[in-house]
Amino acid sequence: MFFYSPNVAPQPSSTSHRRPTLTHQHHLHVGHLDTRLSVQIPEILSRSLVHDPERTRLVPEQLRFIIDENQELWTGSQPPTGFLELCASPVSSVFSNADARRMSQRKLVLRRPTISIQEDGKIIIDHVTARWEGANINSQSALLDADDGATVITDTIKDDQDDKEPKSCPQQTVKYIKILTPHVILVSVLIGYLCLGAWILMLLETRTELLARSKKLVRLTNLMSNFTAESWKMLNNAQHGVSNMDEGEWAATFREWMVRVSETVDDRRPIRRELNRPDDLSNMHNKWTFPTAILYVLTVLTTCGYGEVSVDTDVGKVFSVAFALVGIPLMFITAADIGKFLSETLLQFVSFWNRSVRKVKQWMSRIRHGRRKSLQSTGGPNDTLDILGVDGTEEKLWFPIGAYVSCICIYCSIGSAMFITWERTWSFIHAFHFGFNLIVTVGLGDIVVTDYIFLSLIVAFVIVGLSVVTMCVDLASTHLKAYFTRIHYFGRAKRFLGMSEELKEIVALLGAMRRKKGGKVTWNDVRDFLDNELRDRPFEPHELLMKLRFIDETSSGMSTIRHNSFQSDFFRESEYIRRVAALRPEQPAYL
């Protein structure tokens, strides 16, 4: 333990550091950890007092009581009354909760973060500086830096507190609104982006499309006139004096047949009305309507094709490329976000179903055997064990690959039932094929949509369908990765598969040594590391935290710092580096 007495003259530079303490809450049962300190003991490593009064406060009465019980550690009969404790966050962080659950369902290990305050007011928080008995740090948390650890632990604390504190209906409503707001904004931005792109393409492509169609109709009219005149001449020469057919009558009959042929070739256009005024653009049928433009930009973002319309102008082509560069990531981010919600909902439903089935089986077993068995309560201190199995281990939900295929097929079937209500001429198979092509980004074909409700349904079907596909891929990724690994390593040795935590730590250690050296790590480097870190490591008694001792700031005092703790900015000061270099001249950079 390191304490600072205000009677010592302050030095020009000042930095305070606090190591973790174990908190014994009165409402928690910590088992064999009862013998540890039952109060929060501050440890301050400092060469001088922090001058800012806002950063310090008096040591609590509990600490004074503990000090009274350890009067033999003091030179006088009474402990000094001017001790100061570094102000830290009053919130204790849950550390390695999963490990504590495996030991006992009623054990919970709490620890406080390490907090360092610099002269400029910067606060450095380190959550991974100590290993407590029964709650070891895993390899992933050990590789986190201080900022990442602080973020993870802080989020966990906030979630736990939110779950425990009862909230009123307005508070719950505000909470859900805050959760839904960014996702609603994301979907709204995507829909607005689609509408903006459709409107811009309509402005760019409408006149070009109408002019091209007008020229086509003028050519068709001239062709029909020339063919009529030439045919009449041929017919008149062939039947000179034999037939009494009038020219106008013959032209009208022949023109009608040609119009019918044109309507057969282009059955989606009102060609009979357009032929009456081929030079009038307002009389032309425009295929760049808002529904077709929406479908086109939708196919651009979903990387599928649409055969009804295409971009012809150079400006429109450039705009389509720029629109796709921004819109494609936006589309897939939105689909991934919705898919994540769907996957979490599905996992929660399956987890709830499994718990319900397990409880029903336990209840039936009690009735069958005629004896009462205590079941896990749904309230109280075991709320955190809802997602755990009977043995206290976390359940791993598994779905066969066929379940994901069935999910996509069911969604396409629902869409086909919706499509055939709007397109009466479609069969179920045709509608199913159309919906499947939409969500797997094959293409829209050459469908022409005139109803805005049907258009909205298609857009919603595509966005939600991509989310469903993303959800299925997200849930099946673990199994697909396992199958791919088996295929990839078929007939070969599987390297680094099923690696234990110890091996992973060794690999991480070698990586840190390689980054420090800047080249290949040799056996001599590993041997030097083992000699410096294992042979020269000072001994730390197991009951170190159970005793209160004064240790002045000498090299031996600094050696009690745990060798595996991350260095905060306090440890990077020149004075400390000099002192540590004297103890461990070849200390690795990652320590």
UniProtKB/Swiss-Prot annotation:
Its family remark reads:
Belongs to the two pore domain potassium channel (TC 1.A.1.8) family.
Transmembrane ranges? 184-204, 289-309, 318-338, 400-420, 428-448, 453-473
Which terms in the GO cellular component ontology are assigned?
A: plasma membrane
Q: Which organism is it from?
A: Caenorhabditis elegans
* A biological process term (GO) from this entry: potassium ion transmembrane transport
Q: Any idea which GO molecular function terms this record carries?
A: outward rectifier potassium channel activity; potassium ion leak channel activity
Q: Which residues are glycosylated?
A: N226
Region: Disordered, residue numbers: 1-24
Its annotated compartments are: Membrane
- How does the protein associate with the membrane? Multi-pass membrane protein
Phenotype of gene-disrupted mutants: Worms exhibit defects in mobility. Mutation causes a dumpy (dpy) phenotype thought to be due to hyper-activation of body-wall muscle. Severe mutations cause paralysis thought to be a result of fully contracted muscles.
What the protein does comes down to: Has a role in mobility, possibly in the transport of potassium in muscles.
Gene name, per UniProt, is unc-58
- Mind telling me which InterPro entries this protein's record contains? 2pore_dom_K_chnl, K_chnl_dom
Q: Which UniProt keywords apply?
A: Glycoprotein, Ion channel, Ion transport, Membrane, Transmembrane, Transmembrane helix, Transport
- UniProt name for this protein: Uncoordinated protein 58
